[in-house]
Regions:
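Short, acidic, Ser/Thr-enriched surface-loop or helix-capping motifs
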Residues: 198-199
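Charged, low-complexity helical/coil segments in non-catalytic cytosolic or luminal regions
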Residues: 2-192, 209-211
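Hydrophobic "anchor" residues
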Residues: 192, 203-204
């Protein structure tokens, strides 16, 4: 059984301000050159050719998830007797679903890695962005379904055998949120490679490199 309230038709848009500069992103990448399984002379011979800031859009659905579940767990005593414990569990927590709203396949970014908090209103044209694609209605549906699955997964962790569950989803926010990343291109020998830096915290999100 599912009980839901509708989300407002208008989609809010927000963005995370960039928290690091181009220079900080450059230094983060150069540190990354020295770590992991990479060519031993990468830090010495790599040449950064481009380093630019780009905002990528994510769908984000925040909802209060509620559920009541009944079920049981069983265990066998040393004597061989099978014991059954009956449980009733309640869930009342906030759940967050995110999904990249553009094609970032070559960068390997699929979900938002930042928690809600610190965003500012998005002003179109104020920053360089990748355009959001796809249907907002379909994204909203995927978000609802995903959060219901999260609720049931949490319930299943508490009750070994669920015999009855009812989930309730109360949407709070459905929005597009734009997140800054520094895209750093570099060369090594005749090869061309890319590193993605979190534009808020300065962490490396992913990258390609020549192997040892």
């Amino acid at each position: 059984m599912v009980l839901e309230r509708s989300v407002e038709d208008r989609i809010a848009e927000s963005m995370y301000p960039a928290g690091i500069t181009k220079g900080v992103a450059d230094k983060a990448v150069r540190r990354w050159f020295t770590k992991g399984v990479k060519a031993p002379d990468l830090a010495e011979k790599a040449r950064i050719t481009e380093n630019y800031l780009l905002y990528i859009p994510f769908w984000r659905f925040i909802a209060q998830g509620k559920a009541v579940g009944c079920g049981y767990s069983e265990y066998r005593e040393a004597s061989g007797n099978l014991l059954r414990n009956v449980f009733e569990e309640l869930i009342d927590e906030e759940f967050v679903w995110t999904e990249c709203a553009c094609d970032t396949g070559k960068y390997g970014i699929h979900e938002l890695w930042l928690e809600p908090g610190g965003e500012v209103p998005y002003v179109p044209g104020s920053v360089a962005v990748m355009d959001a694609g796809g249907s907002a209605a379909e994204a909203s549906t995927r978000g609802r379904e995903a959060i219901h699955a999260m609720i049931r997964e949490k319930m299943a962790k508490r009750i070994q055998n669920v015999t009855l569950d009812k989930t309730f989803l109360i949407p709070k926010v459905f929005e597009l949120v734009y997140v800054p990343i520094w895209i750093v291109h570099y060369t090594y020998g005749s090869g061309h490679f890319t590193v993605i830096v979190d534009g808020v915290r300065g962490e490396i999100l992913g990258g390609t490199s020549p192997a040892n």
